[in-house]
Amino acid sequence: MLTAFARAFKTPDLRKKLLFTLGIIVVYRLGTHIPIPGVDYKNVQECVDQASGNQGLFGLVNMFSGGALLQITVFALGIMPYITASIILQLLTVVIPRLEALKKEGQAGTAKITQYTRYLTVALAILQGTGLVATARSGALFSGCTVAGQIVPDQAIFTTVVMVICMTAGTCVVMWLGELITDRGIGNGMSILMFISIAATFPSALWAIKKQGELADGWIEFGTVILVGLVMVGLVVFVEQAQRRIPVQYAKRMIGRRSYGGTSTYIPLKVNQAGVIPVIFASSLLYIPALIVQFSNSTAGWATWITKNLADTAATPHIILYFFLIVFFAFFYVAISFNPEEVADNMKKYGGFIPGIRAGRPTAEYLSYVLNRITWPGSLYLGLIALVPTMALAGFGANQNFPFGGTSILIIVGVGLETVKQIESQLQQRNYEGFLR
């Protein structure tokens, strides 16, 4: 692998892409520390110190922003508005015929959907920025902090508007940086920024576990967590690479004096076809009712029930509902992202067939059957990998922001593998050996 990295840097265009990507990452990390007007950062730091790693409701969003959310910086919202907008557009594509038609128009349609995603991202950034500022002003952002109500000293409307504008502009810059990486760098830009945001929280989270440990001054807990994390990474890599290959043959055809077809290939169906999307969907859904309770500041019976059973990640109802939501969204996302009828029609159009299966509708039914069977273990794996770390490592003072939690590991491994594969394909195009030998 080190040799492959060396070869990548020796290739001028690859070196340029890698250095460009690294430069954008540096700019992104610098942006997470740029303050916005109207915030007393001395009080913010005091509240962060008092939180002692227990960041409550905002932990997931804080992880995706690389810790910028609870610091209330320009990039406080991170890429979460863009992720949410992308998910909403994907869902709307299924139910709105106009968007579905755009998706089938190729590059022009994709560009139009991307434009809609940008508009929706800005709208969501304004909403989320307003919610964050309102929460910070009320003191609910750090509920256990003694100076939480003094984070935003100036309660004027103008100050609030300026803060929201700064956060929205920061989200637009993050979106632009991600698109720059996609166009001129290595890998998918938004995925790379998400990877960096999560990885940036690892050192402080690990050190917090060491400080909270009691055995051998915390080093036993620290080492155990590292070991468990490595085992989990290995497991996730194994499952993410696992796939069912459906053999496909193409009939030989004579057009003029030339022979076409007669080749064999396969359709790769991954065990985890949905990726990390079901986990993000489930987390977002469970986040909404708890957020409503926090904004309403209600003490009614329904609010108490939600706080006790849904907002608490260690509560049994939360764990059960979270697991079933992940399984449901795994099947749902696979259904909207992989169309067996479309695949079968394309195979039939170009003379392809699955050995032993008739072309057309029987092929689509066979693909649906295989996909359903392979999605079951994939969805159960997603649910377990998202829950087991929380339950098994509760004794180490871990919370929903634990660095080796299901969501973070799935994203880190998934993005890492895709980026390495892209570099590998670029190397192989230049007759070099890649990483995955």
UniProtKB/Swiss-Prot annotation:
Component of the Sec protein translocase complex. Heterotrimer consisting of SecY, SecE and SecG subunits. The heterotrimers can form oligomers, although 1 heterotrimer is thought to be able to translocate proteins. Interacts with the ribosome. Interacts with SecDF, and other proteins may be involved. Interacts with SecA. One of its GO terms (cellular component) is plasma membrane. The central subunit of the protein translocation channel SecYEG. Consists of two halves formed by TMs 1-5 and 6-10. These two domains form a lateral gate at the front which open onto the bilayer between TMs 2 and 7, and are clamped together by SecE at the back. The channel is closed by both a pore ring composed of hydrophobic SecY resides and a short helix (helix 2A) on the extracellular side of the membrane which forms a plug. The plug probably moves laterally to allow the channel to open. The ring and the pore may move independently. It is a multi-pass membrane protein. It is found in: Cell membrane. This is Protein translocase subunit SecY. Keywords: Cell membrane, Membrane, Protein transport, Translocation, Transmembrane, Transmembrane helix, Transport. The chain crosses the membrane at residues 19-39, 69-89, 122-142, 157-177, 189-209, 219-239, 275-295, 318-338, 378-398, 400-420. One of its GO terms (molecular function) is protein transmembrane transporter activity. It comes from Streptomyces coelicolor (strain ATCC BAA-471 / A3(2) / M145). GO terms for biological process: protein transport by the Sec complex; SRP-dependent cotranslational protein targeting to membrane, translocation. Belongs to the SecY/SEC61-alpha family.
